[in-house]
Amino acid sequence: MKKLFLIFMLLTPLAMAYGEREEIVVSPIYGKQKNNNDKNSPVKGVTGSGVKISFEGKAGIDDNAIMGLGMGVMYNSLKVKGKDINNNSGNLFSVPIYFMVGTGTDNGIYTKFSFGLSVANGSVKWTDKNGGSGKIKAMPLNGYGAIGIGVQKNKFSFGINGIVTPRLKRQYSSPTKRYNDKFSDSVVSLEFGYQPNYKD
């Protein structure tokens, strides 16, 4: 966690120094954690709600088109749910660094496509009544992707995003079954942006 925070602090000035519109963006995240009622299938749907705080710099490149850079820190809960599952809650921390393209250089509607890399950490463990135990752990280096739409007015912006969370490595072992694979969840977030250096 300390390493992720250090990366965030070192790279944030790059995002803030780039672009005509520099924003601080706070994004409450909604992730649905699913019950795992089928004990013969791998556990999935473990990424829950959280928050993302990011710094973004955007600049107009042609009429209404924009390009930009972003840097953030994201937290999500991790939990394995189920009728016969004993679990511990865990946390997923990640630091996404991303490039943005989209539309919206002035007040009005904007669109945003983000893609880049994400450094992640976190895990959750569980046991079940069949004598099995498992662990889900974040992959340390991942791709990052998001798509969003919203509206901006002077200092402020508001929108909604779909985000692919960092890939997770899943391991499980019981007297009758064993599996080891990787998967990704997706989450939805609102985003509230503030431009501290806005000038009329």
Residue ranges and their predicted role:
Residues 17-73, 79-81, 187, 191-200:
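Short glycine/proline- and aromatic-enriched beta-strand/turn motifs that initiate or cap beta-hairpins
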Residues 35-37, 74-81, 135-200:
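Predominantly the C-terminal beta-signal and adjacent terminal strand-loop region
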Residues 4-13:
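Sec-dependent N-terminal signal peptides
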Residues 28-34, 57-59, 73-79, 93, ...:
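Transmembrane beta-strands of outer-membrane beta-barrel pores
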